[in-house]
């Protein structure tokens, strides 16, 4: 599931912080919720139950029953408001920094640092040249331009008009063919009945306010046997990337990505890792939509 900060949970539940903190402390002690530090903020999410947890079956039963309880409309509304606030902060960053984004991103990693490894991963998937390839948040379009040499049907999906224009300019100046452009996110793509054989999120997931939902959307967008390719940072504690690069999340644990995938019929495939000189680690993760969903 998604992660929420304490103040966000207070808004969602309409409860005072002191009272909520008391309940969260009990849930954390019972290992029903887990915490992750994002800079100066602590986020809470449903814990990943471990195989050796002696109370695993009891906890699973509790959570299954909780999932069956209808969520009140006012809570759904508050969650949506939180998601909109996060998304707006991210969009605001890209509106203000579209002209400088590549420079800012370069503070963490340059595309050339891992492009060769990324193309090796894509080549290993044996995807037909006429397959539908979708890149979510293509930035200035470097990867898409490279992919036009191998594939004929590509779609650039971005919810930032400014960044989508940057991508269009790159594709146009490179005289690349076979690329279409769509303003919006994965929800918009679903509404327009887009289907994909390869869905790529290249250094994008840490900008998305609801990563677990993105996995759900990805599963719906993929054809059976299609692949979701996540290229992102491993978990880190470099809080400066929030202001400098517009990051919402400080990378991701491998277990989190695996959990989000397993819940939406996306099987874990190959994984590649690349350590950078500045201390960051790039993870390239492939998830395949199962032929026979659970």
Question: Which role does the model predict for each range below?
Answer:
Residues 1-19, 40-49, 119:
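N-terminal helix-turn-helix DNA-binding core of bacterial DNA-binding proteins
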Residues 52-99:
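Amphipathic alpha-helical dimerization/coiled-coil segments
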Residues 109-131:
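Conserved alpha-helix/loop element of class I SAM-dependent methyltransferases that forms part
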Residues 132-134, 138-188:
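Class I SAM-dependent methyltransferase SAM/SAH-binding core
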Residues 187-199:
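A short acidic, Gly/Pro-enriched loop at the edge of an enzyme's catalytic core
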Residues 197-210:
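A short SAM/SAH-binding and catalytic strip from SAM-dependent methyltransferases
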Residues 213-227:
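A short glycine-rich, Lys/Arg-flanked "PGG" loop and its adjoining helix->strand segment in the class I
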Residues 227-285:
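C-terminal alpha-helical "lid/dimerization" subdomain adjacent to the S-adenosyl-L-methionine
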């Amino acid at each position: 599931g998604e992660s929420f900060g304490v103040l966000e949970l207070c808004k969602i539940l309409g409860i005072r912080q002191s009272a909520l903190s008391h309940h969260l402390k009990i849930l954390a002690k019972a290992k029903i919720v887990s915490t992750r530090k994002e800079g100066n903020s602590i986020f809470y999410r449903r814990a990943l139950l471990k195989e050796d947890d002696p109370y695993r079956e009891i906890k699973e039963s509790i959570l299954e029953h909780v999932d069956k309880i209808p969520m009140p409309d006012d809570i759904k509304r508050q969650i949506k408001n939180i998601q909109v606030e996060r998304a707006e902060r991210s969009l605001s960053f890209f509106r203000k920094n579209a002209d400088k984004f590549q420079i800012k991103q370069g503070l963490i990693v340059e595309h050339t640092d891992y492009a060769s490894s990324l193309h090796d991963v894509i080549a290993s998937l044996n995807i037909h040249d006429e397959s539908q390839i979708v890149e979510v948040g293509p930035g200035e379009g470097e990867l898409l331009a490279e992919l036009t040499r191998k594939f004929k049907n590509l779609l650039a999906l971005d919810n930032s008009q400014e960044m989508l224009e940057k991508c269009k300019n790159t594709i146009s100046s490179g005289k690349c063919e076979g690329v279409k452009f769509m303003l919006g996110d994965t929800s918009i793509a679903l509404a327009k009945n887009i289907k994909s054989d390869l869905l790529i999120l290249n250094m994008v997931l840490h900008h998305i306010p609801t990563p677990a939902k993105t996995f759900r959307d990805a599963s719906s967008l993929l054809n059976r046997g299609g692949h979701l390719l996540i290229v992102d940072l491993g978990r880190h504690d470099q809080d400066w990337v929030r202001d400098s690069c517009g990051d919402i999340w400080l990378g991701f644990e491998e277990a989190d990505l695996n959990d989000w995938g397993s819940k939406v019929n996306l099987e874990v495939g190959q994984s590649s890792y690349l350590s950078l000189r500045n201390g960051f680690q790039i993870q390239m993760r492939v998830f395949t939509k199962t032929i026979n969903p659970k």
